[in-house]
Amino acid sequence: NQFNNSLVKQLNKGTTLSLTSDLEIELSELITKYVPSAEMVRFGKNGNDATTVAVRLARHYTKRNHILFCGYHAWQDWYVSKTSMNSGIPPEISNYSHRFNYNDINSLETLLNKFKGNVACIMMEPISKVEPQDNFLKNVRFLANKHKVVLIFDEVVTGFRWSVGGYQKICGITPDLSCFSKAISNGMPLSV
């Protein structure tokens, strides 16, 4: 009930403002305080916005195109091109996306070596239906550093459910970029 009352109060003030608001600054400060990887914050409407921006940032920063991923990552062409729902997506887009298996560090290392020097990022959910085993996340971080690849944790599902700092706070592995949505706003349209 407290959340709903706060939501109605904010709806009366406005929700999509063209200039930075005090509320955005306040939330940004809280996020950078509690989330280990958060040095800056960019707001969006949903998890797809957050993961799209993260991949674009990684590609710009590294000047590389390939994406290695595991887990679910919404509706971007790079992700959907590797699924059975790929109708309407140019086939060549799938040439830049490569799935590895969660908890299988060898499958990730094989892809990093196969596309050496061309991988922009590793996009992954830090935890999903199974917990990380055998220092999996620590080894992913090591390989990302070794290959100079941006590590992105998609915490759209996990963020703020496990900890105020996301699952990264619990596991002690800090990604280069993080994506949050859903739980951050109790299902309302917001992502960071």
Where are these regions (language model features)?
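Glycine-rich phosphate-binding segment of PLP-dependent enzymes
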Residues: 1-43
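Buried hydrophobic positions in well-ordered alpha/beta secondary-structure cores of metabolic enzymes
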Residues: 7, 31, 54, 67, ...
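Active-site nucleophile and cofactor-binding loops and adjacent substrate-binding regions
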Residues: 17-24, 42-48, 72, 157, ...
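PLP-dependent aspartate aminotransferase-fold enzymes
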Residues: 26-120
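Active-site core of PLP-dependent enzymes with the aminotransferase class I/II
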Residues: 124-150
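Conserved Walker B
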Residues: 127, 155-157
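Catalytic P-loop NTPase motifs of RecA-like helicase/translocase cores
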Residues: 130, 159-160
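Active-site PLP attachment segment
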Residues: 171-192
